[in-house]
Regions:
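Short beta-strand segments
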Residues: 22-27, 60-62, 87-91, 223-224, ...
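Conformationally flexible catalytic loops at phosphate/diphosphate-handling active centers
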Residues: 83-162
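Peripheral docking tails and interdomain loops at the edges
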Residues: 224-276
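Structural signature of the thiamine diphosphate
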Residues: 57-111, 259-276
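Thiamine diphosphate
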Residues: 1-48, 58-79
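Redox- and metal-dependent alpha/beta enzyme cores, enriched for Fe-S-associated oxidoreductases
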Residues: 159-194, 199, 207-211
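Short acidic loop-to-helix transition motifs that present clustered carboxylates
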Residues: 4-7, 201-209, 253
Length: 276
């Protein structure tokens, strides 16, 4: 995690040069030196562009060991497809977890021809990979081209998991470890007659706005391991038409079932009880 912070300038250069790179960030608590516990405090840094300039990373958020393996394979394909850095954003809990993983063969994905690489100029025009523009006009054209690419990514690469949302009156939104915890909360609440559902973003950027298009829930709770970052994207996704609340633990701590039930009871006037 600290290395990602130190390398933000380099990541900005990679985005400007449109180089396909895969970056892994196992997010631990901070700021500063921080601790080794689980955290999701790098959400803003990862999804909004941590370095200088109007750039974006494709950000994938696994919730278990198998997905850390699968999404890393996917990240290389997405990086090649879009000529863009891709970040796999896990957290300290996942990074220290031991689970069975099925080692899969890489899929034969049809990727664009690399007509930009500098592999020798025999019998063709020269190519140049650069992250700078010497005139304002060229710089603006580059910026507009990047934004068009980012819009294409938003249109085609949004990914999420939904769980028990078809009849849900209330929703939890959580990614990574929080998404994993939230699924057990949904099952426990359903056992007590509360129609709770889960949306687990898999791409944090592009944020899966499409997952919220037909949601008619009475309220939403975002579950995060930070001081409230993803909640901003959830509010934008529902156009602030649904009340969105927030619960978190920080510093490497994880939320308990009773604490989440207490928050749901408080915000939505429910009567959920642990252990029923």
């Amino acid at each position: 995690q600290r290395n990602e912070s130190l390398k933000q300038e380099g990541i900005s250069y990679l985005a400007a040069a449109e180089l396909p790179v895969v970056i892994i960030n196992v997010n631990r608590s901070g700021p500063g030196l921080g601790g080794l516990g689980a955290s999701q405090s790098d959400y803003f840094q990862s999804t909004k562009g941590g370095g200088h300039g109007d750039y974006r990373l494709i950000v994938l958020a696994p919730s278990k060991a198998q997905e850390m393996y699968d999404y890393t394979m996917l990240a290389f394909d997405l990086a090649d497809k879009h000529r863009n850095p891709v970040l796999v954003l896990a957290d300290g809990f996942l990074g220290q977890m031991m689970e069975p993983v099925e080692l899969k063969e890489a899929q034969n994905v049809q990727l664009p021809e690399k007509d930009w690489i500098t592999n020798g100029a025999k019998d063709r025009d020269k190519r140049k990979i650069a992250s700078y523009a010497l005139t304002n006009e060229v710089a603006e054209a580059s910026c507009l081209n990047w934004q068009k690419k980012y819009q294409d990514i938003k249109d085609t690469e949004q990914m999420w998991e939904d769980f028990q949302v078809e009849d849900a009156e209330y929703l939890i939104v959580g990614y990574g470890t929080c998404g994993r915890i939230a699924k057990s909360i949904v099952l426990a609440a359903r056992a007590q007659g509360v129609k709770l559902g889960l949306i687990r973003p898999i791409t944090l950027w592009p944020f899966p706005e499409k997952a919220f298009q037909n949601i008619i829930a009475k309220g939403i709770l975002t579950l995060e391991l930070n001081s409230g970052q993803m909640i901003e994207d959830v509010k934008l996704a529902v156009n602030c038409n649904i009340p969105v609340h927030f619960y978190s633990r920080q510093g490497g701590m994880l939320p308990t079932q009773q604490a989440i039930f207490d928050k749901l009871n408080l915000e939505f006037n429910l009567n959920l009880k642990e252990g029923l």
